[in-house]
């Protein structure tokens, strides 16, 4: 009885996996065989060019001095607003426990 359930479950899983793989292979084959129109090709080429420039520079691409000044100004504002601590670490908070007065309850 248990073996029948296991065989039934394995056949269901096998068929589900095969359908999923057939669907994925069919979609990717169509996507790779599709020719791009000239506008799409230019767009994709520019994105690849930008990616290679960004990886080479290690940061933003084609920035001028005004961008760096704006970045420094915004970082300065953040430091003024949230303290002069390290901006890369999460701040530590210190909360004091409230002081409670003990009030004697009158006996009646």
Curated annotation (Swiss-Prot):
Q: Which residues carry this modification: N6-acetyllysine?
A: 41, 46, 79, 84, 94, 99, 105
GO MF terms held by the record: proton-transporting ATP synthase activity, rotational mechanism
Q: Which domain of life is it from?
A: Eukaryota
Modification Phosphoserine, positions: 108
Can the keyword Magnesium be found in this entry's annotation?
A: no
Could you tell me which residues carry N6-succinyllysine?
84, 94, 99
Q: Which keywords does the record carry?
A: Acetylation, CF(0), Hydrogen ion transport, Ion transport, Membrane, Mitochondrion, Mitochondrion inner membrane, Phosphoprotein, Transit peptide, Transport
In the record, biological process GO terms are: proton motive force-driven mitochondrial ATP synthesis
List locations, semicolon-separated.
Answer: Mitochondrion; Mitochondrion inner membrane
The annotated transit peptide is positioned at: 1-32
GO CC, sorted alphabetically, is: mitochondrial inner membrane; mitochondrion; proton-transporting ATP synthase complex
Q: Which family does it belong to?
A: Belongs to the eukaryotic ATPase subunit F6 family.
Q: How does it assemble?
A: Component of the ATP synthase complex composed at least of ATP5F1A/subunit alpha, ATP5F1B/subunit beta, ATP5MC1/subunit c (homooctomer), MT-ATP6/subunit a, MT-ATP8/subunit 8, ATP5ME/subunit e, ATP5MF/subunit f, ATP5MG/subunit g, ATP5MK/subunit k, ATP5MJ/subunit j, ATP5F1C/subunit gamma, ATP5F1D/subunit delta, ATP5F1E/subunit epsilon, ATP5PF/subunit F6, ATP5PB/subunit b, ATP5PD/subunit d, ATP5PO/subunit OSCP.
Q: What does this protein do?
A: Subunit F6, of the mitochondrial membrane ATP synthase complex (F(1)F(0) ATP synthase or Complex V) that produces ATP from ADP in the presence of a proton gradient across the membrane which is generated by electron transport complexes of the respiratory chain. ATP synthase complex consist of a soluble F(1) head domain - the catalytic core - and a membrane F(1) domain - the membrane proton channel. These two domains are linked by a central stalk rotating inside the F(1) region and a stationary peripheral stalk.
Query: By what name is this protein known?
Result: ATP synthase peripheral stalk subunit F6, mitochondrial
Question: From which source organism is this entry?
Answer: Mus musculus
Name the lineage. Eukaryota, Metazoa, Chordata, Craniata, Vertebrata
